[in-house]
Design a protein with these regions (language model features):
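A cross-family phosphate/adenosyl-ligand binding-site feature
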Residues: 1-123, 128-191
Length: 191
């Protein structure tokens, strides 16, 4: 049986990287997916208090057993070559949400999404932004209405300290992928 070709795009919500690494490990061990790692330019090159970028990238590439896509030039062939069956963007930052909503293609991740969507194939978004219920709310609403866009269930992660913040339930990425491959949105979206 052929494995499902999964693009896994990582944006710069650095505090979630340890959770993302665990989910990529689970998906890799499931033996269902052949995973293509994709990094935003910031996720690929920015060292933070959470991790050194080169270490994180190396770990993900080792799990996926392939080099990452990390530039617009490298992401563009995803469409014409029909490289992927499904594409996940997790964590998806507010900045990336706004660009996807507006059709701006100026990063490796936004190019990967644009190139993939041209083939009418599913994109799964795992939100992680402090402004989801503020400036990013309209972008989430816009993307919810778009064909072939699906969301990982999300919740307020700190309703007192960060009342506008939403983070997806990363443990539901696999389940969301299964639904999206059937052109269905997992429910509920807000948990």
């Amino acid at each position: 049986m052929n494995k499902i070709k999964l693009g896994f795009a990582v944006c710069g919500s650095f505090c979630t990287f340890s959770k993302i690494k665990e989910e990529i490990k689970k998906l890799s061990k499931s033996d269902i997916y052949d995973i293509y790692p994709i990094f935003s330019e910031y996720a690929y090159s920015t060292d933070t208090r959470f991790c050194k970028s080169s270490d994180f990238v190396s770990e993900i590439e080792e799990i996926c057993k392939r080099k990452s896509i990390k530039s617009i030039k490298e992401a563009e062939p995803i469409g014409p070559k029909k490289m992927l069956d499904i594409l996940a963007v997790a964590p998806c930052t507010g900045n990336t949400l706004s660009k996807l909503s507006a059709g701006i293609t100026d990063t490796s991740v936004t190019m990967a999404v644009k190139a993939h969507l041209r083939n009418g194939r599913p994109v799964v978004i795992g939100v992680s932004t402090n402004y989801a219920l503020g400036t990013s709310a309209s972008n989430i609403g816009c993307l919810l209405s778009r064909k072939n866009i699906y969301f990982v269930p999300m919740r307020q992660d700190d309703c007192i300290g960060k009342p506008r913040s939403l983070v997806c339930d990363f443990s539901k990425i696999g389940e969301t992928l299964n639904f999206a491959l059937k052109n269905e949105q997992i429910q509920p979206i807000f948990i």
